[in-house]
């Protein structure tokens, strides 16, 4: 991008691009420098330039960018993948839920408020209370991608001064090349796009947690209105089927709820870059996304295998 725009020599841009396709930097080789510098980029750039063995071209590597530009842009490329995987899982879960909701739309069962019998509802209606919020989250993804999957290229203090008069065009073209969106500004200390993605993932995990909590109750001994599949065996009580999958989902939901608070605290940056806030984000955001992905994985299997116990539902209504 920079070479084509004349920000750096075109031949150097081509050489750097070609080298990036051929050179594989060993992550272990930059571990020590990452620990010393608090970020991997200085060691990565140094190792890459050494492997290039073309100092006349490698001198233009990382031109006009700062470590945070690299880290944040790479983060958004990973968030894009995470959202795609989540979208696929949500669609699979919704298919399973909609099939059951349609099949058992008229199957009566007791509704419960404060865990006590209330007026009758149906298994289809119960499933709809889980599926509709997931559908809402799914429908938000296109807007979320536009508003949050941003490129970062703003330089050391967020001013883009090192890129000269073509700074805006360089950022725009880089965004297009990577399939990201151009925020048209620096967002080094504005973690709004990160929070949007994390909040969306946390909300999905909470929706799944509500489903898991209800399934724990419905599969409990003495109620037995839903079976969950073949998992959850006990080593000493073979008659039991422990609700392992819904328990895991609820636990993940609880964990994400706490981490979300920490991530919001990490959005408070001092000056133009804040190491404490940045490091806190690194410790919380990956776990929010991974826990959300794990909850989706459990829910995908659970929604495909849970089975209503018709006789018990009917008997519970008297």
Language model features with spans:
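A glycine-rich, basic-preceded beta-loop-alpha segment at the flavin cofactor/substrate interface
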Residues: 61, 179-187, 226, 261-272
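Generic, well-ordered alpha-helical scaffold segments in large soluble proteins
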Residues: 47, 51, 96, 100, ...
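A structural signal for small-residue-enriched, beta-sheet-centric alpha/beta enzyme cores
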Residues: 67, 164, 170, 177, ...
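Glycine-rich cofactor/substrate-binding loops
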Residues: 1, 32-38, 223, 237-318
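Acidic, glycine-rich loop-and-beta core segments that form the ion-binding/anion-interacting portion
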Residues: 169-257
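Alpha-helix capping and helix-loop boundary segments enriched in small/acidic/polar residues
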Residues: 70, 110, 114-125, 161-165, ...
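Short amphipathic alpha-helical segments with heptad-repeat character
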Residues: 35, 80-87, 91, 98, ...
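A helix-coil-helix interface module used to build multimeric assemblies
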Residues: 1-154, 160, 166-171, 244-248
